Amino acid sequence: MNKKIKIPKDSKAINYKTTDLIREFISDRGKIIPQRITKSTRKKHKLIEKAIKQARLIGLMPFKQKNW
């Protein structure tokens, strides 16, 4: 699971509406990929986590994957 994910430099690009971007930070089982694997900074990873959680609550993204 050593895939390099391109993280945008603009922090405004990371929000709950950009589901195609934040889906890359979710594993096959539906869990958020840790910071040490994605090689993102602490600040960016917190923004990503917040965006994923907001998208899940609104209903844009599932909490669990269907095949798991």
Swiss-Prot record:
Annotated keywords: Chloroplast, Plastid, Ribonucleoprotein, Ribosomal protein, RNA-binding, rRNA-binding
State a single Pfam family of this protein: Ribosomal_S18
Localization, per the record, is:
Plastid, Chloroplast
Could you give one GO CC term from the UniProt record? chloroplast
Q: Which domain of life is it from?
A: Eukaryota
Per UniProt, subunit arrangement is: Part of the 30S ribosomal subunit.
Q: Which family does it belong to?
A: Belongs to the bacterial ribosomal protein bS18 family.
Q: Name the chain's protein.
A: Small ribosomal subunit protein bS18c
Organism of origin is: Cyanidium caldarium (Red alga)
Query: What gene name is listed for this protein?
Result: rps18
